[in-house]
């Protein structure tokens, strides 16, 4: 992952945390009776969207990075086996 992706991920996570803390405080104040909550369904859906966007973005980026690493390892291992004239060791298995 690049530094830009890490910065964007951290800022997205902080935004989600702040929005959720704000919602929890509103619910707490409403429960105590100090605050009357506005019914704003769009804010709720925005928070859910940001949360799932954050999760999906990082899961997909993690899977894509792992697939690239796995594919690279498999290709390197196969080329090692094909190019080696006699023996090659791949994952502790002796291939002749």
Swiss-Prot record:
It comes from the Eukaryota. This is Putative uncharacterized protein YOL013W-B. Keywords: Membrane, Transmembrane, Transmembrane helix. GO terms for cellular component: membrane. The chain crosses the membrane at residues 1-21. The lineage of its organism: Eukaryota, Fungi, Dikarya, Ascomycota, Saccharomycotina. It is found in: Membrane. Its main location: membrane. It is a single-pass membrane protein.
